[in-house]
């Protein structure tokens, strides 16, 4: 009996030792196995500038975890890039800002062998952009658009009557109209690079003038803007979307897709706010926002994967349908909602396109003069 008990005890101890040894071995093997780090990507984009599920789709398809941050002006992005070590792998500057940042050595060239969808790009558009980026070495277009006037139909009519010049820059550049529109609120983009060329064009100058006298304090364009300054309610490059949609302002000089988003939000809210977007008859600027990779990016392969993903016709079509901005992928147009593909405020017709002008890069001296002017103007000096 005792022998049996002793044998049973020995067997139990042996099994216990075996289990402990197995656990130690298993732990050792687990510890020895390399842990695969999650692939990551840091993406810095404009606010309200991507479809709701674009990033989630990319993460699901690739297994890459995306950290997505937003900005609302080129100046904010530029400050981060020029300071260095921004931490971002993919950013979206406007083409003119991209051009001067290329000169500063901020970006690395794209590896086009990793971009199988490069063939989908609008080649005439790429030719235009090559003037800012030789051989299109550094960037590809994400979305593009125009700068125009968004206005609350009823409020503008109330302040100015039936004959309000809503099809002209006169609406916002003539003090006699602006003095009245101040009652319902006027918003301007917070960007000298966007607004000053429009003022130059309005007074009959080259919107891309290289003449320093056109940027002097007493120049025609500068005085035009100073004369309307008392009537501008706010300078901001994103808040005007909701402010216009909610009826908090009645006029916004802003970007086409933003104003169309405001229109859509007002319709969804059924709040009685009716908004229109107009490309003024005098013409306006057209701009391109680019996908580029900073020189100090840590995850360049993943950045290329996202660029390639965003050039897929089905993906970029979903983005255009959501943000109301046109894209540079012709094959996507058949996938767009009818209200977008047929809307000449989004995809301008030939007659309107003829009045559009791309912006060029300023010289450092003109940049400095513009920055100083804009600071003075905003503070009312």
Model-identified regions with their sequence ranges:
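Conserved C-terminal helix/tail region of periplasmic/extracytoplasmic solute-binding proteins
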Residues: 242, 350-381
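Early extracytoplasmic/lumenal segment of secretory-pathway proteins
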Residues: 38-101
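Ligand-binding pocket segment of bilobal, Venus flytrap-like solute-binding proteins
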Residues: 184-276
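Bacterial N-terminal signal peptides
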Residues: 21-32
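Hinge/lid segment of periplasmic solute-binding proteins
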Residues: 99-146, 165-173
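Mature extracytoplasmic/periplasmic domains
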Residues: 289, 294-355
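Short beta-strand->loop
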Residues: 108-119, 269-285, 294-296
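Sec/Tat signal peptide C-region and signal peptidase I cleavage site
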Residues: 33-37
